[in-house]
């Protein structure tokens, strides 16, 4: 199975059964992600080397204004899609198998978790994985230690308060805070 076939399967939202070919490919990609993130996190890397490693991890050319403060962790890497001038602060964890799409000029605070996989709810199906992408618009600011759950879309220019758990879509231009995150006002108020 190629990386492209894996990404296509995951981006369709099809379940992944434990032990299946797609599950084995997921494990293979996770091992590569562990190897590359250990290089990112294991020592100081000048910005150009950090960019090269991140491009290798996600398989995408990065904008020269991309910023990352390690450590950074991801379970796959190949289904992260970054816009221009994205900044990811230290300690972030991306579970990207289901797809993480981040728009231009987005800021992601320390220790943010973005998850894209769920498990079956019935005990006999818990080993199965259900991918669901996360879409983060342009100009979004995600505060430190936030958790973004599978299937969420955050609209352009939204602000997510520190420590929030985002379980549902957040409209553009809104500020959302809390657990679960709730819209409290417009950024223009």
Segments and roles (model prediction):
Residues 1-63, 181-184:
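Terminal amphipathic alpha-helical/low-complexity segments used for targeting or macromolecular assembly
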Residues 141, 159, 175-177:
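Short-chain dehydrogenase/reductase
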Residues 153, 167-168:
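Active-site/ligand-binding-proximal alpha/beta "capping" segment
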Residues 155-158, 171-173:
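Conserved catalytic segment of ABC-fold P-loop ATPases
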